[in-house]
């Protein structure tokens, strides 16, 4: 990318660091991971969980959610000012599952947020350790990305539901900082901006006064984040137009939806990180592994190695397939919801199938579900190979932008073609090329038309054996070029809607 020099690496964002060398980054990411691990061990002690119960992913999610809620300052402030019946703003909790007499029981727990904050800080040498909190947010976001298809949200903001591959990180909270911004897809950023523009159209005071000034700063900051994700000059120039608009309205809305569509072929750079549940880090720390001393990276072999020797369990509903549940969590762990299934299958070493064919619902269990019939099983999260996570979008060098199937945002840096259905995508680009962005639009459409689905991306990049820690011998897989593999293709996954 052109602006490489000005960007901090994702690990630096992850750890709020200034410029650091590779060893320092590995150490500070390791420090963040061991903090999460220590916190998790302490919480399992507090809750008197057995080893098995502590490795249950549903318990992990509840504990993670509690600490995120305890540190959600804006929401905590709001809850104190707007008390609602039956909700104590100072407490947080959720369902904890325990094994009693051969059956799984649900127990609702409640803790003081202050107490949770104390335990978290204690596990992190007295720091607030925001990086660790963000890490857990990204894990939850990756799990949502693999579990739900955001068609309704796309339609609501006037975008095409087939653009779901652009929606990575769409459920990340606003407070997820630079590390969160790095993993957001083009569609997610566009959707956030469109929501602001719509509010501005409906509420004339939105951009006015002291509050309006803050709103404006937020708007421009989001525009700059989105601009930084685009890799072609024309797309970036259009973002400048959107950002500089005196009074954002319909023209900006049009430009943004145009840009979102263009990203299906001229893909943006979106970071991918393997963020694992706390119940993986806890036992690793407990077994004496020193993450800070050994160093850790979210984009290399480390998460793969960690998952190779971790035991994680999950509750299973009566008609769910444990192997399918495992696939869902594996994809979430590697942030691979929008990766080509051919690539994921090769790395995992077992066939990864589309969401619509999975006999499994989400990982979370609703409070009204019957526990009587609930079983549990081991999640198979191991892989056959490992590969480096990418943040490039996989555009080939000739055009700085290549073909992208209507549903892929690559996760792994592995050579393949990125197949896409040009007719479907180009059909969306009829007509409107007039107005102040006409020359940029024309240029973008020209680039899209010259993109070929058979172009090879990530030339020469391959996967590695798990014994090849230094990534010395890339194995370049050969894929059936004609066969696209998108996860949400023609699908009926549940909606993510709160």
Swiss-Prot record:
Late in virus-infected cells, may be cleaved from a 56-kDa protein to a 53-kDa protein by a cellular caspase. This cleavage might be a marker for the onset of apoptosis in infected cells or have a specific function in virus host interaction. GO terms for molecular function: RNA binding; structural molecule activity. It is found in: Virion; Host nucleus. GO terms for cellular component: helical viral capsid; host cell; host cell nucleus; ribonucleoprotein complex; viral nucleocapsid. The keyword Zinc-finger does not apply. It comes from the Viruses. InterPro entries: Flu_NP. A motif (Bipartite nuclear localization signal) lies at residues 198-216. SUPFAM superfamilies: flu NP-like. Pfam families: Flu_NP. Coiled coil: none annotated. One of its GO terms (biological process) is viral penetration into host nucleus. Belongs to the influenza viruses nucleoprotein family. Homomultimerizes to form the nucleocapsid. May bind host exportin-1/XPO1. Binds to viral genomic RNA. Protein-RNA contacts are mediated by a combination of electrostatic interactions between positively charged residues and the phosphate backbone and planar interactions between aromatic side chains and bases. Encapsidates the negative strand viral RNA, protecting it from nucleases. The encapsidated genomic RNA is termed the ribonucleoprotein (RNP) and serves as template for transcription and replication. The RNP needs to be localized in the host nucleus to start an infectious cycle, but is too large to diffuse through the nuclear pore complex. NP comprises at least 2 nuclear localization signals that are responsible for the active RNP import into the nucleus through cellular importin alpha/beta pathway. HAMAP family: INFV_NCAP (MF_04070). This is Nucleoprotein. It comes from Influenza A virus (strain A/USA:Huston/AA/1945 H1N1).
């Amino acid at each position: 990318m052109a602006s490489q020099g000005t960007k901090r690496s994702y690990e630096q964002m992850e750890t709020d660091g200034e410029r650091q060398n590779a060893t320092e980054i590995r150490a500070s990411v390791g420090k963040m991971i061991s903090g999460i691990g220590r916190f998790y061990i302490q919480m399992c002690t507090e809750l008197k969980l057995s080893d098995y119960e502590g490795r249950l992913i549903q318990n992990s999610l509840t504990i993670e959610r509690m600490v995120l809620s305890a540190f959600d300052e804006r929401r905590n402030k709001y809850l104190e000012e707007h008390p609602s019946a039956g909700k104590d703003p100072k407490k947080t909790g959720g369902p904890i599952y325990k094994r009693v007499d051969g059956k799984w029981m649900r127990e609702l727990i409640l803790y003081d947020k202050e107490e949770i904050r104390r335990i978290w800080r204690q596990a992190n040498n007295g720091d607030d350790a925001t990086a660790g909190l963000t890490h857990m947010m990204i894990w939850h976001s990756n799990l949502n990305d693999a579990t739900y298809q955001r068609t309704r949200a796309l339609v609501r903001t006037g975008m095409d539901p087939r653009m779901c591959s652009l929606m990575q990180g769409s459920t990340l909270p606003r407070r997820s900082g630079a590390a969160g911004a790095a993993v957001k897809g083009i569609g997610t950023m566009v959707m956030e901006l469109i929501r602001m523009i719509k509010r501005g159209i409906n509420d004339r005071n939105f951009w006015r006064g002291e509050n309006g000034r803050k709103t404006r700063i937020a708007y421009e900051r989001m525009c700059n984040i989105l601009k930084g994700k685009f890799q072609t000059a024309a797309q970036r120039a259009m973002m400048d137009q959107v950002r500089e608009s005196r009074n954002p309205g319909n023209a900006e809305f049009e430009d943004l939806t145009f840009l979102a569509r263009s990203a299906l072929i001229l893909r943006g750079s979106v970071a991918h990180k393997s963020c694992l549940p706390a119940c993986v880090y806890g036992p690793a720390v407990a077994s004496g592994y020193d993450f800070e001393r050994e160093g850790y990276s979210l984009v290399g072999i480390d998460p793969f190695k960690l998952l190779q020797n971790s035991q994680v369990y999950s509750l299973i509903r009566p008609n769910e397939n444990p192997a399918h549940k495992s696939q869902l969590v594996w994809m979430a762990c590697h942030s691979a919801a929008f990766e080509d299934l051919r690539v994921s299958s090769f790395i995992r070493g077992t066939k990864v199938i589309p969401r619509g064919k999975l006999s499994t619902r989400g990982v979370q269990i609703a409070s009204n579900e019957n526990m009587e019939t609930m079983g549990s099983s081991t999640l198979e999260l191991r892989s056959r190979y490992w590969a480096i996570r990418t943040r490039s979008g996989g555009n080939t060098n000739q055009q700085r932008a290549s073909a992208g199937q209507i549903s892929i945002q690559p996760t792994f840096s592995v050579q393949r073609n990125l197949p896409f259905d040009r007719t479907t995508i180009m059909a969306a680009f009829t007509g409107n090329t007039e107005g102040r962005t006409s020359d940029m639009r024309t240029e973008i459409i020209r680039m899209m038309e010259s993109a070929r689905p058979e172009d090879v991306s990530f030339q020469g990049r391959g996967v590695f054996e798990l014994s090849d820690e230094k990534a010395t011998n890339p194995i370049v897989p050969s894929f059936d070029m004609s066969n696209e593999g998108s996860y949400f293709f023609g699908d009926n996954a549940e909606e993510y809607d709160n």
